[in-house]
């Protein structure tokens, strides 16, 4: 799970301290959503925004978090199908690689996995990629089945039913 908070939210400074030693929720992945107007104000010299930005960067240096999600940039560059439907991308997942829309009724979820490039020669001429996609789809099907009737996961279940978002990437590319 990743929690994202708008950088101009009144609780941003408290949010940036969530992962401090002694905090009861140190294991939370977190990100900040930064709109264009806020970033431009900060660049133009707004001292309060510069202080907040410095705290964001200091936190990233110390803890690797928060992830930084540039809201307007993401929505300008979202797929045309999302633009045509008026879908808004509000946040991302715990590593900020997924850009899916969400609403009050639908909380996005995605089943992800990776293929290890170090082992590429072992799987390049096989059906491993196809099987991995089938596996991810089976995981999503099980999620849908097991969350039926669960009020607390109903918005995620609704998204899974409508979108069936799967992602298969690679690791070890460097």
What is the predicted function of each stretch?
Residues 1-88, 170-174:
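Conserved, charged catalytic cores of large soluble enzymes
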Residues 60-67, 71-174:
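Function-dense linear segments that define catalytic or interfacial modules
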């Amino acid at each position: 799970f990743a929690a994202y908070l708008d950088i101009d939210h009144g609780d941003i400074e408290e949010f940036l301290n969530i992962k401090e030693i002694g905090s009861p929720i140190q294991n939370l992945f977190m990100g900040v959503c930064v709109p264009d107007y806020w970033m431009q104000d900060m660049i133009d010299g707004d001292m309060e925004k510069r202080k907040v930005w410095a705290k964001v960067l200091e936190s990233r240096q110390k803890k690797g978090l928060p992830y930084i999600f540039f809201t307007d940039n993401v929505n300008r560059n979202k797929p045309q199908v999302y633009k045509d439907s008026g879908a808004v991308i509000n946040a991302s997942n715990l590593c900020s690689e997924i850009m899916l829309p969400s609403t009050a009724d639908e909380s996005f979820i995605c089943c992800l996995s990776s293929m290890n490039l170090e082992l590429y020669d072992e799987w390049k001429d096989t059906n491993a990629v196809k099987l991995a996609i089938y596996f991810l789809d089976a995981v999503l099907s099980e999620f849908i089945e097991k969350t039926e009737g669960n009020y607390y996961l109903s918005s995620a279940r609704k998204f899974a039913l409508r979108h069936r978002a799967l992602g298969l990437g690679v690791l070890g590319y460097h």
